[in-house]
Amino acid sequence: ISSAINNATNRITGQSAWSPMGSSANIEGRMLAEELAGKSRKYPGVLGTGICKLPGLNCGRTGLGESAARNAGYDPVSVITVVDDKAHYYPGASSFIVKMIADKSSQKLLGLQCMGPGAVDKMIDIAVMAISLGADLSSMEYLDFAYAPPFSTAIHPFAHTLNVLLNKLNGDMDSFTPVEYKEGKAQGYTVLDVSINPTLEGKEYVNFTKIDGVLPNHPTDENILLVCAKGKRAYLTQNRLKYYGY
């Protein structure tokens, strides 16, 4: 048993997984010792959890990515969010970029990827626990996470991302993933800049707070792609436009 040579089992798929991690190697070492001492133990496998630190940036992941989930027979749905890692007014506050992946039919959490200068490990470890317990998204919707401005946001960044994914799965939000956009699924869509201030050169700017009906020169059957910095204003604009028949 060694972190250098470690061919384990992925606990989601049941398939062989290369996971040369010191953490799982130590767990396996403990289990081996217990087996040698006469206790029967069964190792459930790994999730491929990993984390690293770069200059000014922490990156972590656990579970299945979209491609791996699809190859394992799941129908994955994902969202990417940019969320505050603590109260925005607190010194040292920054952001997480989070990708959350779930199975479409069961809505079970399959994977999480997170990067940012803050406590990425906490985001990953929450996902590890959820995936290991077979949790679906709705069962985590109202978890009572620890909150104080130095540590988190009032709606935890994990819960925030989960809510966005639930909105997408339940049909309350329509969005493209970057991969879908690259594949051309937004071909023929009219791009509208809905940021706080105009940011996209050559694109029409729309302030959602000023929308009080059908947009001039944009019929309700037009395919429109709403773009902003973090997704929040695009979501609010989408809701406003749906109200007016789009």
Task: Tell me what each language-model feature is.
Residues 211-246:
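Catalytic cysteine-centered active loop of the rhodanese-like fold, especially the PTP/DSP P-loop
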Residues 117-136:
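A short, polar/charged loop-to-alpha-helix boundary motif
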Residues 193-199:
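Short, polar loop motifs at secondary-structure junctions
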Residues 137-143:
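Catalytic P-loop NTP-binding/switch module of NTPases
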